[in-house]
Amino acid sequence: MTAILEKLALYWAYPFVRYALIVGVLIALCSSLLGVTLVLKRFSFIGDGLSHVAFGAMAIAAVLQITNKMPLVMIITILSAVLLLRTGQNTKIKGDAAIAMISVGSLAIGYLLMNIFSTSSNLSGDVCSTLFGSTSILTLSPVEVWLCVGMSVLVVAVFILFYNKIFAVTFDESFARAAGMRAGLYNLLIAVVVAVIIVLAMNLVGSLLISALVIFPALSAMRMFKSFRSVTICAAVLSVFCALLGILASILAGTPVGSTIVAVQIGAFGLSWLAGTVLGGVRR
C-alpha cells in the first residue's frame, strides 16, 4: 500500500496527470447529470450516435489538416444533434432508425476519409486512439484542459438553471406541452449539451466508449434511489468516483484510461445492483 501511495505521489508531480484528473472529473460530472435524463427519456443511444458523428468530424478535420480539431468537431456534432432531433420527429423515420442511420453513416465515412487522405504512418493507431481514447494521458494539453473547464462550467450552469424544465420534459413531455412549456426547445437544449459533452470526452475515453459515461452512472443510481434529484446526485457522485479510480488505476497498471474507467463503472453497476436488490428485499 505504501508503495502504491509513493508511486501516485510521484506521478502527481507531473502536470499531465493533474490534467487528466481534472478533465476526467469534469467530464464524468457533466455526462452523469444529463445521463439520468437520457435514460429516462429512452434517448440513451443518442450519445452513441453523436459519438460516431464526432469520429466522422474528427476525420474531416484530419483531412483538412486542421491543428485544433475541437471547434470543427464541436460545430458538426452540435448540428448533427439538431438534425437527429428533427429527423426523429419525422413520422416516416423513427428516432431509433435516425440514430442508426446517422451513426453508422458517420462512422463509415469517417473511416473511409481517414484511409483515403491520411498521411499518418500509423493509421490503425490513430483510428484506435480516436475510437477507444488515447492510450496515454500525455495527449491532454493546457488549452484542452481550460476549454474543458469552460465548457463543463457552461454545461453544469445550464443544467442548474433549467433543472425544473428538464425535469418536466423528462417525466411527462405531453403534460409539459399542455402546460405551455416549449418542450421542443428544451429537448433541443438537451441534445446540444450532450453533443458538447461527447466532444469533450473523446480525448479521454474515445468515441465508442462515451455512452458508458452517460448510461452506467444513471442506471447504477436508479437501482438505489427513486426520486429524480436523488438519482441525479448519486449518479454524479458515482461517476466522479469511478473516473478518479479509473484514472488512478490506469496510471498504476499502465492500461488505457477510457477502458479502465468503463471497467470500474461496470463494477460499480454490479455493486449497486446487489445493493438495490438487498434494499428492495428489506423494504418488502
Please describe what each predicted stretch is:
Residues 23-31, 57, 61, 72-84, ...:
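Alpha-helical transmembrane segments in multi-pass membrane proteins
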Residues 36-121, 221-233, 250-254, 277-278:
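Short loop segments and helix-boundary regions at transmembrane helix junctions
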Residues 1-29:
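Membrane-interfacial amphipathic/re-entrant helices at transmembrane-helix boundaries
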Residues 21-25, 70-75, 97-101, 145-150, ...:
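Hydrophobic alpha-helical transmembrane segments
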Residues 255-284:
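Cytosolic-side transmembrane-helix boundaries in multi-pass membrane proteins
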Residues 203-259:
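Transmembrane alpha-helical segments in multi-pass inner-membrane proteins
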Residues 140-217:
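Helix-loop-helix "hairpin" substructures at the membrane interface of multi-pass membrane proteins
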Residues 4-10, 103-160:
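Transmembrane helix-bundle core of multi-pass membrane transporters
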